[in-house]
Amino acid sequence: LCKAARYRYINNDMADLERCLQEAQEQRFRVIVTDGVFSMDGTVAQLDKICDLADKYDALVMVDECHATGFVGKTGRGTIEHCDVLGRVDIITGTLGKALGGASGGFTSGRKEIVDMLRQRSRPYLFSNTMAPPAVAGALKAIDLVSESSTLRDQLRENTAVFREGLETHGFELLPGEHPIVPV
């Protein structure tokens, strides 16, 4: 939908990302887009290093937190909290259909001027429908639950550890990690 030049970097490879940013220096704007947690293997993006490169090359940072919202980070604020880059990420996207109870819909957040521009210029947004009130209520309740207590996050961490241990006991070779995505 966008006619901007795109540069693809090797997954989680900061040297390759820097190469792309150097190549993009002549572009009017630069936006680094990444998942916070990669869904295929549970790898966590190196957001601290990505933000450092964004500062160095005057780029915005956009993080998709679909696989992190609600359960990654001390209070469930995702990889942005986990990597200690709160306030350094310009655009955050996520879904209400995974950790927040399976409600439909999603979200994009950022500074007011960015959100205003997206509302005016994003064709998918212009032609989309609002969420049904019961879905909004369900998502808000899920946010309340993960915000008020770490009990559910703690239980998920324990369940993930037991699951990993069980798989390894039965001879499965797993990639290291603590994320609930456990690639087999």
Q: Where do the model's predicted regions map?
A:
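Helix C-cap/helix->beta junction micro-motif
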Residues: 2, 56-57, 170
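Active-site PLP attachment segment
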Residues: 75, 81-117
